[in-house]
From Swiss-Prot:
Protein name: Chromosome segregation in meiosis protein 2
Any one Pfam family match given in the protein's UniProt record, by short name: CSM2
Role this protein plays: Involved in chromosome segregation during meiosis. Promotes efficient recombinational repair and functions in the protection of the genome from spontaneous and induced DNA damage like mutations and gross chromosomal rearrangements (GCRs).
Phylogenetic placement of the source organism: Eukaryota, Fungi, Dikarya, Ascomycota, Saccharomycotina
Keywords, comma-separated and alphabetical: Cytoplasm, DNA damage, DNA repair, Meiosis, Nucleus
Subcellular compartments: Cytoplasm; Nucleus
Spans traversing the lipid bilayer: none
Family: Belongs to the CSM2 family.
Chief location category: cytoplasm
Amino acid sequence: MKIDIGVDNKCGDFVTYMKDEAFNSQLHYISAISSFPISKMMELLPLSGNETIYESVNVLSSVDLSDLNRCIRSLYQRIIFSPLPKQSDANTDDSNNSNNANMQMETGKIKTDRHWICIEGIQTMFQYSQLKDPVEAHASLNDTMLRLRLLQNKCPSIEILFLLPPHEAPEFIQSLQEHDISRNNIPHRRQGKRFKRDNTGILIGDYIWKYYI
Protein backbone atom coordinates (compact mmCIF):
# COMPACT_ATOMS: atom_id res chain seq x y z
CA MET A 1 0.00 0.00 0.00
CA LYS A 2 1.17 3.51 -0.80
CA ILE A 3 0.21 7.13 -0.24
CA ASP A 4 0.51 9.66 -3.04
CA ILE A 5 0.31 13.38 -2.39
CA GLY A 6 -1.42 15.45 -5.05
CA VAL A 7 -4.10 14.05 -7.33
CA ASP A 8 -3.93 16.39 -10.31
CA ASN A 9 -1.55 14.40 -12.50
CA LYS A 10 -2.62 10.82 -11.83
CA CYS A 11 -4.24 10.31 -15.25
CA GLY A 12 -0.83 9.91 -16.85
CA ASP A 13 -0.05 7.10 -14.40
CA PHE A 14 -3.46 5.52 -15.02
CA VAL A 15 -2.88 5.51 -18.79
CA THR A 16 0.63 4.06 -18.47
CA TYR A 17 -0.67 1.32 -16.18
CA MET A 18 -3.64 0.39 -18.36
CA LYS A 19 -1.70 0.41 -21.65
CA ASP A 20 0.89 -2.12 -20.51
CA GLU A 21 0.23 -4.96 -22.96
CA ALA A 22 2.00 -7.52 -20.77
CA PHE A 23 -1.02 -7.62 -18.42
CA ASN A 24 -4.80 -7.60 -18.33
CA SER A 25 -4.93 -4.47 -16.18
CA GLN A 26 -7.96 -3.33 -14.20
CA LEU A 27 -8.29 -0.01 -12.41
CA HIS A 28 -10.69 0.34 -9.46
CA TYR A 29 -11.25 3.99 -8.56
CA ILE A 30 -13.09 4.70 -5.29
CA SER A 31 -13.85 8.30 -4.36
CA ALA A 32 -15.91 10.31 -1.89
CA ILE A 33 -15.14 13.76 -3.25
CA SER A 34 -15.01 13.69 -7.05
CA SER A 35 -15.85 11.72 -10.14
CA PHE A 36 -13.29 9.82 -12.16
CA PRO A 37 -11.28 12.27 -14.33
CA ILE A 38 -12.50 10.69 -17.55
CA SER A 39 -12.09 13.83 -19.69
CA LYS A 40 -8.44 14.23 -18.70
CA MET A 41 -7.78 10.57 -19.35
CA MET A 42 -9.41 10.76 -22.78
CA GLU A 43 -7.11 13.65 -23.67
CA LEU A 44 -4.17 11.30 -23.10
CA LEU A 45 -5.84 8.13 -24.37
CA PRO A 46 -8.61 8.54 -26.98
CA LEU A 47 -11.65 6.32 -26.54
CA SER A 48 -11.59 5.21 -30.17
CA GLY A 49 -9.44 2.10 -30.43
CA ASN A 50 -9.08 1.78 -26.65
CA GLU A 51 -12.57 0.64 -25.71
CA THR A 52 -11.24 -2.47 -23.93
CA ILE A 53 -9.09 -0.33 -21.65
CA TYR A 54 -12.00 1.90 -20.65
CA GLU A 55 -14.17 -1.15 -20.01
CA SER A 56 -11.55 -2.22 -17.47
CA VAL A 57 -11.95 0.95 -15.39
CA ASN A 58 -14.27 0.33 -12.44
CA VAL A 59 -15.54 3.53 -10.79
CA LEU A 60 -17.13 3.29 -7.33
CA SER A 61 -18.62 5.93 -5.04
CA SER A 62 -18.10 5.86 -1.28
CA VAL A 63 -19.62 8.44 1.07
CA ASP A 64 -18.28 7.06 4.35
CA LEU A 65 -16.13 4.23 5.71
CA SER A 66 -19.05 1.80 5.75
CA ASP A 67 -19.43 2.33 2.01
CA LEU A 68 -15.69 1.92 1.54
CA ASN A 69 -15.75 -1.29 3.55
CA ARG A 70 -18.51 -2.68 1.34
CA CYS A 71 -16.60 -1.69 -1.79
CA ILE A 72 -13.43 -3.41 -0.60
CA ARG A 73 -15.32 -6.54 0.46
CA SER A 74 -16.94 -6.68 -2.98
CA LEU A 75 -13.59 -6.25 -4.72
CA TYR A 76 -12.06 -8.90 -2.47
CA GLN A 77 -14.73 -11.39 -3.53
CA ARG A 78 -14.38 -10.37 -7.16
CA ILE A 79 -10.60 -10.68 -7.26
CA ILE A 80 -9.98 -13.65 -4.97
CA PHE A 81 -13.08 -15.73 -5.64
CA SER A 82 -13.75 -15.22 -9.35
CA PRO A 83 -16.89 -17.21 -10.25
CA LEU A 84 -16.50 -20.33 -12.36
CA PRO A 85 -18.30 -20.48 -15.74
CA LYS A 86 -21.82 -21.91 -15.70
CA GLN A 87 -22.15 -25.47 -16.94
CA SER A 88 -24.62 -24.47 -19.68
CA ASP A 89 -22.09 -22.02 -21.05
CA ALA A 90 -19.16 -24.40 -20.80
CA ASN A 91 -18.76 -25.02 -24.53
CA THR A 92 -19.00 -21.34 -25.38
CA ASP A 93 -16.67 -20.36 -22.57
CA ASP A 94 -14.18 -23.06 -23.52
CA SER A 95 -14.23 -21.81 -27.09
CA ASN A 96 -13.76 -18.20 -26.00
CA ASN A 97 -11.00 -19.15 -23.58
CA SER A 98 -9.30 -21.15 -26.31
CA ASN A 99 -9.50 -18.23 -28.72
CA ASN A 100 -8.16 -15.84 -26.10
CA ALA A 101 -5.34 -18.21 -25.24
CA ASN A 102 -4.47 -18.62 -28.93
CA MET A 103 -4.42 -14.85 -29.42
CA GLN A 104 -2.20 -14.42 -26.38
CA MET A 105 0.10 -17.25 -27.50
CA GLU A 106 0.50 -15.52 -30.85
CA THR A 107 1.88 -12.50 -29.04
CA GLY A 108 4.36 -14.78 -27.32
CA LYS A 109 3.02 -14.52 -23.79
CA ILE A 110 -0.16 -15.33 -21.87
CA LYS A 111 -1.30 -12.25 -20.00
CA THR A 112 -2.00 -12.28 -16.29
CA ASP A 113 -4.56 -10.17 -14.46
CA ARG A 114 -3.49 -7.32 -12.24
CA HIS A 115 -5.47 -4.74 -10.28
CA TRP A 116 -4.88 -1.19 -9.10
CA ILE A 117 -7.14 0.10 -6.32
CA CYS A 118 -7.08 3.90 -5.96
CA ILE A 119 -8.90 5.48 -3.02
CA GLU A 120 -9.56 9.23 -2.94
CA GLY A 121 -11.26 11.20 -0.17
CA ILE A 122 -10.51 8.94 2.81
CA GLN A 123 -10.55 11.97 5.15
CA THR A 124 -14.07 12.89 4.03
CA MET A 125 -15.25 9.30 4.50
CA PHE A 126 -13.79 9.27 8.00
CA GLN A 127 -15.42 12.56 8.97
CA TYR A 128 -18.87 11.40 7.86
CA SER A 129 -18.44 8.14 9.76
CA GLN A 130 -17.23 9.95 12.89
CA LEU A 131 -20.36 12.09 12.92
CA LYS A 132 -22.58 9.01 12.90
CA ASP A 133 -20.65 6.69 15.21
CA PRO A 134 -17.00 7.27 16.25
CA VAL A 135 -16.52 3.69 17.45
CA GLU A 136 -17.93 2.22 14.26
CA ALA A 137 -15.77 4.61 12.22
CA HIS A 138 -12.57 3.21 13.68
CA ALA A 139 -13.84 -0.37 13.41
CA SER A 140 -14.72 0.12 9.73
CA LEU A 141 -11.36 1.71 9.02
CA ASN A 142 -9.47 -1.10 10.73
CA ASP A 143 -11.47 -3.82 8.99
CA THR A 144 -11.00 -2.14 5.60
CA MET A 145 -7.25 -1.71 6.02
CA LEU A 146 -6.75 -5.27 7.22
CA ARG A 147 -8.80 -6.59 4.30
CA LEU A 148 -6.70 -4.55 1.87
CA ARG A 149 -3.54 -5.92 3.45
CA LEU A 150 -4.88 -9.47 3.20
CA LEU A 151 -5.84 -8.89 -0.42
CA GLN A 152 -2.34 -7.68 -1.23
CA ASN A 153 -0.77 -10.63 0.58
CA LYS A 154 -2.85 -13.07 -1.46
CA CYS A 155 -2.26 -11.18 -4.74
CA PRO A 156 1.13 -9.42 -4.67
CA SER A 157 0.46 -7.92 -8.12
CA ILE A 158 -2.29 -5.73 -6.65
CA GLU A 159 -1.42 -2.07 -6.13
CA ILE A 160 -3.26 -0.04 -3.49
CA LEU A 161 -2.93 3.73 -3.50
CA PHE A 162 -4.43 6.45 -1.31
CA LEU A 163 -4.67 9.79 -3.13
CA LEU A 164 -4.36 12.66 -0.64
CA PRO A 165 -3.96 16.43 -0.74
CA PRO A 166 -0.90 17.68 1.20
CA HIS A 167 -2.86 19.05 4.18
CA GLU A 168 -4.24 15.58 5.01
CA ALA A 169 -0.83 13.97 5.59
CA PRO A 170 1.64 16.61 6.86
CA GLU A 171 3.69 14.18 8.97
CA PHE A 172 4.05 11.85 5.99
CA ILE A 173 5.25 14.77 3.87
CA GLN A 174 7.70 15.81 6.58
CA SER A 175 9.11 12.27 6.70
CA LEU A 176 9.68 12.39 2.93
CA GLN A 177 11.40 15.76 3.24
CA GLU A 178 13.63 14.54 6.07
CA HIS A 179 14.52 11.45 4.06
CA ASP A 180 15.54 13.61 1.09
CA ILE A 181 17.52 15.91 3.38
CA SER A 182 19.44 13.05 5.01
CA ARG A 183 20.08 11.40 1.65
CA ASN A 184 21.41 14.60 0.07
CA ASN A 185 23.19 15.90 3.20
CA ILE A 186 21.21 19.14 3.16
CA PRO A 187 21.01 21.16 6.42
CA HIS A 188 17.55 20.67 7.85
CA ARG A 189 15.38 23.65 8.64
CA ARG A 190 11.99 23.04 10.15
CA GLN A 191 9.11 24.68 8.39
CA GLY A 192 7.14 27.14 10.49
CA LYS A 193 3.81 26.34 8.86
CA ARG A 194 1.55 23.97 10.75
CA PHE A 195 -1.39 22.14 9.26
CA LYS A 196 -4.66 22.30 11.12
CA ARG A 197 -6.33 19.07 12.08
CA ASP A 198 -9.99 18.57 11.29
CA ASN A 199 -12.69 18.69 13.96
CA THR A 200 -12.15 15.01 14.80
CA GLY A 201 -8.57 15.74 15.83
CA ILE A 202 -7.29 13.10 13.41
CA LEU A 203 -5.61 13.43 10.04
CA ILE A 204 -6.43 10.06 8.56
CA GLY A 205 -3.65 10.17 5.97
CA ASP A 206 -1.01 10.32 8.70
CA TYR A 207 -2.89 7.70 10.72
CA ILE A 208 -2.89 5.25 7.79
CA TRP A 209 0.77 5.93 7.11
CA LYS A 210 1.78 5.29 10.73
CA TYR A 211 -0.25 2.18 11.45
CA TYR A 212 -0.96 0.41 8.17
CA ILE A 213 1.71 1.24 5.59
